[in-house]
């Protein structure tokens, strides 16, 4: 009886271990049923936590859910700080990152990007009573707030004599602006516009022309061609069947420009 119990216990342990191994393999194979997706939920309207439901919402969330549906899988969208997204891809903590992320040469060294799903420029946000900053040319020597690892941070690093202050969350940069701790925030224009018309209404304003517009992409781990192809396939399908335009209009209140539908 004792021998039988030992054998049964060993078989049980083996079964559990085998199940875990198979489940782990499923995260990268073609039989994968759920995509683990990371986004920074402080970049409204691209990603944010809905105050009523507590769930993640936004343009990026809807886009990746629509792509996943086309590919016959679920998208489990998780909230991560922006600067943690690429390390999470590299460590296999997540499969996909979508978070208002500009496709850049530097980022493309460590991850692979989908075809562009949005074209966005970077702009300036100042306090509503500010009259000294009207363009990027006025930023020399100014206190500039940016999000760590963002395109805004890269732009700010090139401004002469600027006091660049980096924040984990873009909402913290906006709060520091409100508290007069920085003179200006450099960030993606759609997020800036959403902020000054919501939480920053009557407090802050967008000023000046956009910095060069650049494409946003969906990132996967370097070399994960199978997943990248599925993301691109789903993206092409939602652009062709009208779902992309529907989501775009929902969050930006207008039809998408032709360049975003390519």
Provide a role label for each language-model segment.
Residues 31-100, 241:
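Extracytoplasmic small-molecule ligand-binding "clamshell" domains
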Residues 99-109, 155-157, 178, 183-213:
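A ligand-binding cleft/hinge motif common to bilobed small-molecule-binding domains
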Residues 61-70, 130, 148-150, 193, ...:
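Extended ligand-binding regions for polar small-molecule ligands
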Residues 61, 76-89, 131, 148-151, ...:
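Short helix-initiation/N-cap motifs at beta->coil->alpha
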Residues 61, 74-138, 204-205, 209-210:
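Acidic, polar ligand-binding/catalytic clefts
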């Amino acid at each position: 009886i004792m021998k039988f119990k030992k054998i049964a216990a060993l078989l049980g342990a083996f079964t559990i271990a085998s199940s875990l191994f198979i489940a782990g393999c499923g995260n990268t194979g073609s039989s994968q049923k759920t995509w683990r997706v990371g986004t920074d939920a402080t970049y409204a309207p691209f990603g944010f936590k809905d105050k009523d439901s507590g769930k993640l919402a936004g343009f990026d969330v809807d886009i990746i859910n629509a792509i996943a549906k086309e590919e016959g899988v679920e998208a489990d969208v998780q909230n991560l700080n922006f600067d943690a997204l690429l390390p999470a891809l590299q460590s296999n903590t997540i499969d996909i990152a979508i978070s208002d992320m500009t496709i850049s040469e530097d980022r493309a060294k460590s991850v692979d990007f989908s075809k562009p799903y949005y074209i966005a420029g970077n702009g300036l946000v100042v306090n509503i009573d500010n009259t000294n900053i009207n363009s990027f040319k006025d930023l020399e020597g100014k206190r500039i707030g940016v999000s760590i690892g963002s395109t805004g941070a890269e732009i700010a690093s090139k401004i002469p004599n600027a006091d660049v202050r980096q924040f984990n969350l873009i909402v913290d940069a906006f709060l520091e602006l409100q508290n007069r701790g920085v003179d200006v925030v450099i960030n993606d224009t759609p997020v800036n516009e959403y902020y000054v018309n919501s939480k920053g209404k009557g407090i802050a304003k967008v000023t000046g022309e956009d910095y060069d517009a650049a494409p946003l992409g969906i990132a996967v781990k370097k070399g994960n061609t199978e997943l990248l192809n599925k993301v691109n396939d789903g993206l092409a399908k939602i652009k062709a069947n009208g779902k992309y335009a529907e989501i775009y209009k929902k969050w930006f209140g207008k039809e998408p420009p032709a360049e975003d539908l390519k």
